[in-house]
Amino acid sequence: MGKIIGIDLGTTNSCVAIMEGNQVKVIENSEGARTTPSIIAYMDDNEVLVGAPAKRQSVTNPKNTLFAVKRLIGRRFEEKEVQKDIGLMPYAIIKADNGDAWVEAHGEKLAPPQISAEVLRKMKKTAEDYLGEPVTEAVITVPAYFNDSQRQATKDAGRIAGLEVKRIINEPTAAALAFGLDKAEKGDRKIAVYDLGGGTFDVSIIEIADVDGEMQFEVLSTNGDTFLGGEDFDQRIIDYIIGEFKKEQGVDLSKDVLALQRLKEAAEKAKIELSSSQQTEINLPYITADASGPKHLNLKITRAKLEALVEDLVERTIEPCRIAIKDAGVKVSDIDDVILVGGQTRMPKVQEKVKEFFGKEPRRDVNPDEAVAVGAAIQGQVLSGDRKDVLLLDVTPLSLGIETLGGVMTKMITKNTTIPTKHSQVYSTADDNQSAVTIKVFQGEREMAAGNKLLGEFNLEGIPPAPRGVPQIEVTFDIDANGILHVGAKDKATGKENKITIKANSGLSDAEIDQMIKDAEANAAEDHKLRELADSRNQGDALVHSTKKALTEYGDKLDAGEKEKIEAALKSLEDVLKDTSADKAAIDAKVEELGKASQKLGEKMYADMQAQQAGAAGAAGAAEGAAHAGGAQQAADDVVDAEFKEVKKD
């Protein structure tokens, strides 16, 4: 059985890890980095770039470079968070036929799971290159506060990438696993994981207990905001720069997508620099131009200014901490360790706020970028049966229920219930002789169903005529270990049953996922062809260079006819390399043609080199002979006449 890899599919960066024995290995990607930007670029020639190469070209291709797609995964187009992003993103966010938020690149509609699958495929390939064997199974992390649709969409992304998702695990829980197994402290401890990533915020209160030599990780509560993260901090800096530039130059950069992409890069860089220095300078020459000529942007930002810009964002993370502590039934003073996860927690202001709330210094011995992937890899090892000393008890982050008479949300499973879990309840009809009931499933904490997230709905038909309140309909909610909900309804009188996995009114159908898998496979074949074409071009370029060099050195030793033949073959190879529409076969044919034409040139070079070597060997032999003679002479010269006297024996 192959290894189960752990993948942290992040909003800004992603990371992959595996377990080797009891040691964890965070794997470097093909660029040599341990984290990969979650950025995907769709190029004009159908090539798909993922990670650092996609990020590098984002300034020149803003409309087709997709980033922070995790913020859209499993979301409806109408949601206010999505509507907010539409005005900020350089790429187009569109409404899919099923009402979900999708994006558009090169006129093609793409589902967020399909785009995230490109990042997962890169992570899969990174692991395969390191292990030297195929990888088919993974544990993928999601924010703890992700709802059912978002978890299902993440699982779909894994499927499209060719991975069997063995488990969806919450990011703070994964970080706690990484932290707990790395520390030697014994005894029960309560820890708070404060996870502020690129696009999402989570806080979990977790109890780590030692039960008969087994490490038990029990999540007591979780809370968060799935639309708050480093991207929002970047946006505050971007808005500030746009405002200052408009005041100074009278030009509004928010309408210029190329300028926006440069601003985004500069804002991220400035934010990172201000974590270690008090002031930074943003310098972007030729940011735009008007009738008076080009405009340059030069702006100093201090740490104090940045903190003022994002103060309310940092403050927004504290209320979920308060709720999580209350829901866990503990006091702030009961928390033994505070762990910071996510790149945004490197900001001194964030660390200061966390220290102020929890009353203690956060731990600094956890890598905020890698802890989540490490935890996912540990869970992968547990699921594969290679590790028996770890037990993980996670919770469902939001209450689940159904809409009952008057539009009320009747909760079936309350938030922070340990999963997997199952709950059944009997309901009845609202009208006399009602032959069918529609069951609408919601997720959220509001009293009225309309204020919560509608996950799906289904009908139970064929109920025998009876007065209202008489039929008995048993509704069962079953949450699996991934936090994904399965619902069933049964008429107790007739035994009629209807079951669904909640993904009815949104998300991708199996047919759509299968089509995306096929497209991905076709893309892989296309990518392979592009790679082969690039290899042929490189081979052709190298041959042109070496042939020209050889002609310069040895061309005068060839017959005029032979030289002309080589020059003609060289010219036709150069022409085919200049032709961007030329395929691999055309290039290979010209390479072979030049190779054959250059045979005589090769023979001349070889003969010349042999002659040089023979000459060098002869010279060396002569020198060696001279050295021998000189040595003999020296040996003779080194003879010393010794004085001796004869000793007579008695």
Swiss-Prot record:
A family per Pfam: HSP70
Cited InterPro entries: ATPase_NBD, Chaperone_DnaK, Heat_shock_70_CS, HSP70_C_sf, HSP70_peptide-bd_sf, Hsp_70_fam
Could you tell me one molecular function GO term of this UniProt entry? unfolded protein binding
What is this protein's expression induced by?
Answer: By stress conditions e.g. heat shock.
Q: Which domain of life is it from?
A: Bacteria
- Residues that bear Phosphothreonine: 200
CDD domains the record matches: ASKHA_NBD_HSP70_DnaK-like
Where are the coiled-coil regions?
Answer: none
Q: Which UniProt keywords apply?
A: ATP-binding, Chaperone, Nucleotide-binding, Phosphoprotein, Stress response
Region feature Disordered, mapped onto this chain: 613-634
Family to which this protein belongs: Belongs to the heat shock protein 70 family.
Q: What does this protein do?
A: Acts as a chaperone.
Q: What is this protein called?
A: Chaperone protein DnaK
Species annotation: Burkholderia vietnamiensis (strain G4 / LMG 22486)
Q: Gene name, please?
A: dnaK
